[in-house]
């Protein structure tokens, strides 16, 4: 009993010493900066005690670890609790900082201040993600991507986010009996759900197209999914659908390429985004809205409140409100990317909700899931979640309360604190409510225009080019072919048949089920800006990745000339060789080897000329490339539609890989193969090919593939 008494007396003595100080008041210890910089410091415990040794405290050289080792106990305890529950969906993600700047004053349609001053740069935090996979899943799986954006405005935080509903996620997630497959829908429960819930077919068509496997987060569109309302100071409202339009254009991976990248670089999209920002090649997106007046909301063949539908841009064009620039990577992944908590209910003055049923469900779901992940109602006080404006309300206490509130009042109205924090009228800047008339009876089920599940799936299919439709067919053959239930395969093909008979018959043939007869007519209706192939491309190759293949005896002057040209155009160039750090006569280092990289990680490939022995080496088995990596490098680049430039004897590598070189340079160039020993002329043509990105005319088409009503038309910005 004596030892505990001594400790108690020591604590009491410490309290007496502090209270007896001559200082009238002690400075608060709660005003602590959240930023921590460890470089050049000394290691301490969590309580600030300097650590003298990181080995465990033991009884003798070989004795047991002592329980009194408080340093070891603290370290192990903290390690055991470092992980928090991952997100139920969108667990795999990457986030970056940036800013948004309005193009002009949009006060005619919204009271949101950040959309009224073109000189104001509003900070943003953007998280890109997959939906189905866990935190450790690959980046390049086929999935609907998340594109969540937080605007830190002068009127509070606004989150622009997207997600799907629970049953869909349960069906698409790994099957619960054996927890496979990871991060993919190529299994029976997913397609059983899709065939039983035909309202999903429009989303499934998008996911199985090239949009389900983007090349880069710098080249994806973002969609607000739901219909929201803008409300201005005069209480006038319009309905809006939000869009993010990438200024670097759109680009996608083919499925074979995406699978190989998952094995070569599981963090492919993360690395791509991080590298571009570190190099100053900042991703840029325009925020746009499709605007529909309250009077016109019922004039469409679909319901604006149906989140499974889009407003075709041929009916309502996108009005560009401003531009977002992403220019800074996070300082700490966990503190920022993992702890950020997006919520569609985080809106600001001038923006309000509609009766979209999926949106209404999300308003509950997000709060619930964030409480489960963060284990505290105070997660909004975390640095990444705090608004830039002061927060004053009567919400108190809870686990991990970070704030130290002063005063005796925590309620409203009150007399002791002159009714503060006070409410703010709409006229003085309070939130603007939309006075919507509500009528109707309580009921369940889908009614009216919500019951149309196929017209927009057909519109999407018709708006793809013929080669994009072939990719869709190929992808369905893979996914549906993975379903072990023939009943599920047949049911889903029957669903596809209600979209397009030619599509359904081609898929059916590949998955071993009966080819259906037509049940409806495809009228061939199309709309704009759904085809990736026809999406306008920027007239530059900034941040495009190009591999230059080398070997002993390669023409160093051609290597240097092409590399200098490409880097001058702000492309990223790797020299691929037998061993790292080898210098050629021009002093150019080998940055990758044939065993460390692959053409799937690049946008284009150049093969210079060289000595005869150069290509004898590159086309023969060697320890440096035991699996014919140089041959596979150019063959995969060709199969995946990428531009290939070649000089002189470099053609030997293509021929050995059985890459077609066509009859004549013009025919080859039409298929993205650029052949010339004049590197200056070759480089210019190669640049055009890199801008085009993919040459889908190399892809074989089904013998019975119908020509799409949407023709291929390459558009490059002026």
Can you describe what each PLM-predicted range is?
Residues 552-556, 650-652:
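Gly/Ser/Thr-rich loops at beta-strand to alpha-helix junctions
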């Amino acid at each position: 009993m004596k030892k505990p008494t001594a400790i108690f007396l020591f604590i009491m003595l410490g309290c007496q010493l502090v209270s007896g100080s001559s200082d009238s008041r002690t400075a608060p210890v709660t005003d602590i900066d959240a930023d921590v910089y460890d470089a050049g410091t000394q290691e301490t415990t969590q309580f600030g005690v300097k650590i003298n040794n990181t080995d465990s405290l033991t009884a003798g050289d070989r004795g047991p670890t002592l329980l009194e080792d408080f340093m070891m106990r603290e370290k192990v305890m903290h390690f055991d609790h470092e992980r928090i529950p991952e997100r139920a969906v969108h667990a795999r993600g990457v986030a970056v900082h940036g800013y948004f700047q309005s193009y002009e004053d949009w006060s005619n349609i919204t009271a949101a201040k950040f959309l009224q001053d073109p000189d104001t740069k509003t900070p943003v935090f953007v998280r890109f993600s997959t939906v189905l996979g866990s935190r450790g899943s690959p980046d390049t799986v086929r999935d609907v991507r998340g594109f969540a954006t937080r605007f830190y405005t002068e009127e509070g935080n606004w989150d622009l986010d997207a997600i799907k509903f629970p049953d869909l996620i349960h069906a698409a997630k790994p099957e619960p009996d054996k927890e496979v497959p990871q991060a993919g829908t190529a299994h029976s429960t997913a397609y059983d759900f899709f065939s039983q819930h035909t309202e999903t077919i429009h989303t499934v068509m998008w996911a199985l197209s090239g949009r389900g496997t983007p090349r880069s987060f710098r080249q994806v569109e973002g969609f607000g999914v739901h219909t929201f309302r803008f409300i201005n100071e005069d209480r006038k409202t319009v309905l809006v659908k939000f869009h993010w339009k990438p200024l670097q254009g759109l680009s996608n991976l083919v499925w074979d390429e995406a699978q190989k990248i998952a094995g070569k670089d599981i963090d492919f999209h993360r690395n791509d985004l991080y590298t571009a920002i570190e190099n100053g090649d900042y991703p840029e997106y325009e925020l746009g809205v499709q605007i529909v007046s309250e009077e016109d909301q019922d004039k469409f063949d679909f319901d604006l409140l149906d989140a499974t539908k889009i407003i075709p841009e041929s009916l309502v064009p996108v009005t560009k409100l401003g531009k977002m620039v992403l220019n800074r990577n996070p300082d700490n992944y966990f503190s920022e990317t993992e702890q950020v908590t997006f919520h569609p209910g985080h809106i600001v003055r001038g923006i309000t909700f509609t009766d979209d049923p999926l949106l209404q469900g999300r308003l509950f779901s997000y709060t619930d899931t964030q409480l489960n992940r963060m284990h505290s109602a105070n997660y909004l006080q975390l640095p990444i979640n705090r608004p830039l404006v002061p927060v004053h309300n009567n919400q108190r206490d809870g686990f991990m309360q970070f704030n130290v509130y002063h005063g005796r009042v925590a309620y409203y109205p009150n007399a002791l604190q002159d009714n503060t924090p006070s409410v703010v009228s709409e006229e003085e800047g309070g939130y603007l409510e939309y006075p919507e008339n509500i009528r109707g009876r309580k009921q369940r089920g889908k009614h009216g225009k919500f019951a149309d599940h196929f017209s927009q799936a057909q519109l999407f299919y018709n708006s793809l080019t013929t080669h994009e439709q072939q990719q869709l067919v190929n992808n369905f053959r893979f996914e549906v072919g993975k379903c072990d239930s023939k009943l599920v395969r047949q049911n889903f093909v029957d669903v596809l048949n209600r979209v397009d008979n030619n599509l359904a018959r081609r898929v059916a043939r590949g998955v071993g089920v009966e080819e259906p007869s037509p049940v409806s007519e495809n009228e061939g209706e199309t709309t704009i800006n759904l085809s990736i192939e026809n999406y306008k491309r920027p007239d530059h190759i900034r941040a495009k990745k190009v591999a230059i293949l080398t070997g002993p005896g390669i023409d160093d002057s051609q290597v240097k000339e092409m590399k200098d040209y490409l880097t001058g155009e702000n492309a990223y160039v790797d020299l691929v060789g037998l061993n790292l750090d080898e210098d050629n006569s021009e002093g150019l280092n080998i940055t990758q080897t044939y065993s460390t990289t692959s053409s799937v990680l690049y946008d284009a490939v150049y093969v210079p000329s060289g000595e005869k022995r150069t290509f004898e080496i590159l086309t023969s088995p060697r320890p440096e490339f035991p699996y014919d990596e140089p041959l596979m490098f150019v063959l995969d680049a060709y199969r995946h539609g990428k531009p290939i430039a070649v000089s002189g004897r470099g053609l030997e590598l293509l021929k050995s890989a059985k890459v077609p070189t066509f009859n004549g340079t013009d025919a080859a160039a039409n298929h993205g193969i650029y052949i010339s020993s004049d590197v200056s002329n070759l480089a210019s043509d190669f640049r055009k090919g890199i801008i085009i990105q993919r040459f889908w005319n190399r892809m074989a088409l089904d013998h019975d593939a119908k020509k799409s009503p949407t023709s291929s038309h390459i558009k490059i910005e002026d």
